């Protein structure tokens, strides 16, 4: 991606040993054109479409609610730490994940440094601390070969972002300096990474 296709890394997620768990890469002056993350694969996590303003995302939520189709909302609306984008994740009728996003940042300056997030910092997934649903790490769309047959899934054998720490699936209160337990009101229907 870097040498042959001319991509540059905008942001990545690493641990103290330098293990890369994910990287956001771009060719245009936006945060990313593609992102590579770890997990079982090959799979497509989601496809994203940009919109102009946050109110467009709220309007989508309102329309889904009015149509009694709000179950299509998987996650959000919210704001990512990585990319700073305002987002909404939906599931289409076939179960594929679709992101509608806006307001990431301009990356046209070639001297911009790579923004590196610690894998233990859960604000990387959601700036506001909203939990990430377990399906975020578990589900992805099947990749087909050139004949239209599903490509067999290969289980990940190296370090997994989800397995790195309880809470790597987006929960707050998992930074090393945070010693208190997650508040009871935040536990509910969401599961920690070790409970999936």
What does each model-found stretch correspond to?
Residues 1-31, 195:
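Core segments of cupin and vicinal oxygen chelate
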Residues 2, 48-98, 102-196:
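Vicinal oxygen chelate
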Residues 23, 45-46:
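Conserved acetyl-CoA binding element of GNAT-fold acetyltransferases
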Residues 26, 37, 91:
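Residue-level detector of conserved, well-ordered beta-strand and adjacent loop positions
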Residues 30-34, 96:
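Short, charged/polar, Gly/Pro-enriched secondary-structure boundary elements
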Residues 33-36, 44:
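Solvent-exposed, charged amphipathic helical/linker segments at domain boundaries
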Residues 41:
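Long C-terminal interaction/binding lobes of large macromolecular proteins
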